[in-house]
């Protein structure tokens, strides 16, 4: 059985993949409390299921490997007003738990840069 994490709003309440991945981890932790033989999902596992795992359904997507479609978000977590110096992995984790569209500075789909959605809407910066 192949499982992935997707953002089908009809089946959930947000198209934000970072929030869907975090919710998957949280729900798996609750499940693990009642089913000791089923370990909780880790954030790296959820990240895989939301990226490269999706390729099991949609083809060569979800990875920066040669031959894959370049679909990516460029995120900036430096505006969070953090007191700590964080590694790239820690910044990615921070985006999954605390980030939103204000942290996304560029979007790419099939190698093409996408325009910012709703550019006329100016949101208050975090921090």
What function would you assign to each model-found segment?
Residues 69-119:
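C-terminal cap of metal-dependent C-N hydrolases
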Residues 13-14, 85, 125:
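Short secondary-structure boundary/hinge segments and terminal tails
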Residues 1-81:
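His/Asp/Glu-enriched, well-ordered alpha-helical/loop segment
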Residues 117-127:
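Intein/HINT protein-splicing elements and their conserved insertion hotspots or analogous self-processing inserts
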């Amino acid at each position: 059985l192949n499982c992935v994490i997707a953002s089908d709003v009809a089946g959930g309440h947000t198209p934000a993949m970072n929030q869907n991945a975090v919710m998957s981890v949280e729900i798996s932790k609750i499940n693990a409390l009642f089913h000791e033989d089923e370990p909780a999902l880790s954030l790296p596992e959820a990240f895989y299921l939301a990226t490269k795992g999706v390729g099991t359904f949609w083809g060569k997507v979800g990875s920066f490997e040669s031959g894959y479609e370049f679909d990516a978000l460029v995120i900036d977590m430096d505006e969070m007003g953090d007191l700590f110096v964080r590694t790239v992995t820690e910044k990615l984790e921070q985006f999954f738990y605390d980030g939103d569209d204000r942290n996304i500075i560029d979007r790419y789909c099939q190698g093409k840069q996408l325009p910012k959605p709703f550019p006329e809407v100016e949101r208050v910066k975090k921090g």
